[in-house]
UniProtKB/Swiss-Prot annotation:
The keyword NADP applies. GO terms for cellular component: membrane. Binds 1 FMN per monomer. It comes from Methanosarcina mazei (strain ATCC BAA-159 / DSM 3647 / Goe1 / Go1 / JCM 11833 / OCM 88). Residues 4-199 form the Flavodoxin-like domain. Its EC number is 1.6.5.2. InterPro entries: Flavodoxin/NO_synth (IPR008254), Flavoprotein-like_sf (IPR029039), Flavoprotein_WrbA-like (IPR010089), FMN_Rdtase-like_dom (IPR005025), NQO (IPR037513). Belongs to the WrbA family. It catalyses: a quinone + NADH + H(+) = a quinol + NAD(+); a quinone + NADPH + H(+) = a quinol + NADP(+). This is NAD(P)H dehydrogenase (quinone).
Amino acid sequence: MVKVNIIFHSVHAHIYRMAEAVAAGAREVEGAEVGIYQVPETLPEDVLEKMGAIETKKLFAHIPVVTRDMYEDVLAGADALIFGTPTRYGMMTAQMRAVLDGLGKLWSEDAFVGKVGSVFTSSGTQHGGQESTILSFHVTLLHLGMVIVGLPYAEKRQTIMNEITGGSPYGASTIAGGDGSRQPSENELEMARYQGRHVTQIAKKIAGK
């Protein structure tokens, strides 16, 4: 059985919806054990309320939060990790960064070497830093010794020109709009499903399972 865990940070549920699509794609692979977790939120409740995020966060309140005592099992114990984060100034969010910065002990034990890593993202605008967010995330995965998998052009949905859409060879993505009102399109969700399936297939081959 190949173990795949999706780790995400979401505020207005865009990344959560993409994460669910990634998980659905991963579950299509025979023998896949798929988990989905969110990272701890570090913003205080009054800030979240001003952002209008209290209600949207309730949509995925049932998703377990990955805490430090779970790192060895949930993170190091997986054959593949697929990370989802909104873009913040062209990089991952501080909430996601905090989890990765807590992996020092496991890194020193080579716990992630040879495991598959992949990333998906969202931004408020079409050119809001999606590619730089994924590529800068890859740097950390390489330091951990992971094998990076993206979204190949075999997934033709990323080449369509008749609608606004996220997606690049680096990973699936969605465009939320400046006010967060745009939800992931079916095209974007299908790319996320493809990425989940593709990553899981490769992880299964690498793990020999």
